[in-house]
From Swiss-Prot:
It catalyses: tRNA(Pro) + L-proline + ATP = L-prolyl-tRNA(Pro) + AMP + diphosphate. HAMAP family: Pro_tRNA_synth_type1 (MF_01569). The gene is proS. SUPFAM superfamilies: Class II aaRS ABD-related, Class II aaRS and biotin synthetases, YbaK/ProRS associated domain. One of its GO terms (cellular component) is cytosol. GO terms for biological process: prolyl-tRNA aminoacylation. It comes from the Bacteria. This is Proline--tRNA ligase. One of its GO terms (molecular function) is transferase activity. The keyword Nucleotide-binding applies. Coiled coil: none annotated. Its EC number is 6.1.1.15. The keyword Hydrolase does not apply.
């Protein structure tokens, strides 16, 4: 490809609205342009990277026996109503109404569509298991699109769905897809860590996310410093063995705390440690009120709360609701003499002796509060976020944190969708059974951004060879010099004939501009044709290491091939 005809509008300045490196570099390297918030046009460089990623995905999935299909982007509301997700999915589901007043959704995922297809196509155990996949654009009405391709409203995704007669078959497919994902990300040059995760709006139980480690990651990974344990912080279990300090129980006292309403303010006012304070939160759990208790130095994990109680809807009470239910303002509520609500506590409360809590009275708190004597807990559960330094849940080492970008996730859905949409099969005994399902997603466009987050330097992108838009960037440093253009053109064609993807910079620009753009675009190897062109020599630079060597044109093809092989290892 000759750059003079190639749509790659590079930029010198960092765009003001681009907060993360991948977004900045994709804009500056002429890979994408924004159409609206969270919506982008993919220019030729980006499309070439995406095609290479898609090729890796297809190769690995085809080897597992998965079959590629294409499903519609537009979904009738009736399918989503059957599954119950028309309302449950919330505002992120993009909905529209056609001219006949029929409702549709732009698909964020395809569980409903694929389940209805298999329901109508397969009815015997002899046709199972089955695994199908597609690669297409998805849509989510993100409240706050940001970070370029990391959180957009339209994005490219690979989604796969498997159907099974039993749990053993599903477990086998889950392992097959888990391993395929590991190979896909490794081949794409991504440093990825699989972590235990929450299934969210997709549903099901067992699930793992594949996290690309990066400073800008929106997800926090909790991992052991001495084992392979890793989980999304939302799902990391707390295994602290709490014990009560051996202290004499002091008499409870009511004290004035003025305008101190936060944990920190109360701790400072009373000169106590935050871990001595009982944090009380009024929460609506499936439309019933509960008082949630945590230690002052701990934070409520609403995912854990939802799982612990088997709840579908959880929200914090408003200030008005706290006043109506408890009779006081936020910041002064507590478990002593509270009536009409269930009291649910995190295990950390067991470690508090002579603690502090709100007195359910304006500007007042109790000190020297003790469970059993002063209040009763109805249920204990693991309700808090794990913290760095906590014991690892597997009993090996302590917990450390890292940031990650979710690039893939695998789910065991079970019968969540098949039962609701009636996807059944006849077993060996002729009995109707619901199919067990798995689903498996990869964020293809997000992978592009994740690769850049992990592979860049101060000058631009540093593409891994497997997903680079081209293998080699040939620069004709002075297009007015006939010998340079002649050699550059010869080098360009000889590399192409060797089966390499080559970009030839034949623009009438200064050499400095070409070098800057080459570093910014970040192809694995650069071949500069300059002053020694009349002798047949060119300069080869390895983008990743900065190594520069002079090579005669007659030896260029084997040299380039050897360098690419070294980079791929």
């Amino acid at each position: 490809m000759k750059q003079s005809f190639f749509l790659v509008p590079t930029m010198r300045e960092v765009p003001a609205d681009a907060d993360v490196v991948s977004h900045q570099l994709m804009l500056r390297a002429g890979m994408i342009r924004q159409v609206a918030a969270g919506i982008y046009t993919y220019l030729p460089l980006a499309r070439r990277v995406i095609r290479k990623i898609e090729s890796i995905v297809r190769e690995e999935l085809d080897q597992t026996g998965a079959q590629e299909i294409t499903m519609p982007t537009l979904h009738p509301a009736e399918l989503w109503q059957e599954s119950g997700r028309w309302e449950k999915y919330g505002d992120e589901l993009m909905r529209l109404t056609d001219r006949h007043n029929r409702q549709f959704a732009l698909g964020p995922t395809h569980e409903e569509v694929i389940t209805s297809l298999i329901r109508d196509s397969i009815n015997s155990y002899k046709k199972l298991p089955l695994n199908v996949y597609q690669i297409q654009s998805k849509f989510r009405d993100e409240r706050r699109p940001r970070f370029g391709l990391l959180r957009g409203r339209e994005f490219i995704m690979k989604d796969a769905y498997s159907f099974h007669t039993g749990g053993e078959s599903l477990d086998e497919m889950y392992k097959v897809m888990y391993d395929a994902y590991s190979r896909i990300f490794r081949r794409a040059g991504l440093n990825v860590r699989p972590v235990i995760a929450d299934s969210g709006a997709i549903g099901g139980k067992d699930t793992h996310e594949f996290m690309a480690l990066a400073d800008v990651g929106e997800d926090t990974i909790a991992y052991s410093d001495q084992s392979d344990y890793a989980a999304n912080i939302e799902m990391a279990a707390v295994k602290v063995n709490y014990t009560r300090p051996d202290e004499p129980l002091l008499e409870r006292e009511l004290v004035d705390t003025g305008d101190a309403k936060t944990i920190r303010a109360v701790a400072e006012r009373l000169s106590v440690q935050e871990e001595k304070i009982i944090k009380s939160l009024l929460v609506s759990i499936d439309d019933e009120w509960a008082l949630i208790l945590l230690r002052g130095d701990h934070e409520l994990n609403d995912i854990k709360l939802k799982h612990a109680l088997g709840a579908s809807d959880i929200r914090l009470a408003t200030e008005e609701e706290v006043l109506e239910v408890i009779g006081t303002e936020v910041g002064t509520i507590g478990p002593v003499d509270v009536k009409g609500v269930k009291v649910i506590a995190d295990h950390g409360i067991k470690s508090i002796v002579n603690g502090v809590c709100g007195a359910n009275e304006s500007n007042k708190h109790f000190i020297h509060v003790n469970e059993e004597r002063d209040f009763t807990v109805d249920t204990y559960a693991d309700l808090r976020f794990i913290q760095e330094g906590d014991p690892s849940p597997d009993g090996k080492g302590t917990i450390r944190f890292a940031q990650g970008i979710e690039v893939g996730q695998v789910f065991k859905l079970g019968t969540v969708y098949s039962e609701k949409l009636g996807a059944t099969f006849l077993d060996e005994n002729g009995k109707s059974q619901p199919m067990l399902m798995g689903c498996y997603g990869i964020g293809v466009s997000r992978m592009v951004a994740a690769v850049i987050e992990q592979h860049h330097d101060e000058d631009g992108i540093v593409w891994p060879t497997s997903v680079a838009p081209f293998d080699v960037h040939v620069l004709a440093l002075n297009v007015k010099k006939e010998e340079q253009m002649k050699l550059a053109d010869s080098v360009y064609h000889s590399l192409q004939q060797a089966g390499l993807d080559v970009l030839l910079d034949d623009r009438p620009e200064r050499a400095g501009v070409k070098f800057k753009d080459a570093d910014l675009i970040g192809l694995p190897l650069r071949v500069a044709v300059g002053k020694r062109a009349d002798e047949g020599y060119v300069e080869v630079k390895v983008r990743k290491t900065g190594e520069v060597i002079e090579v005669h044109a007659d030896e260029l093809v084997p040299t380039i091939q050897a360098k690419l092989q070294q980079l791929a290892e």
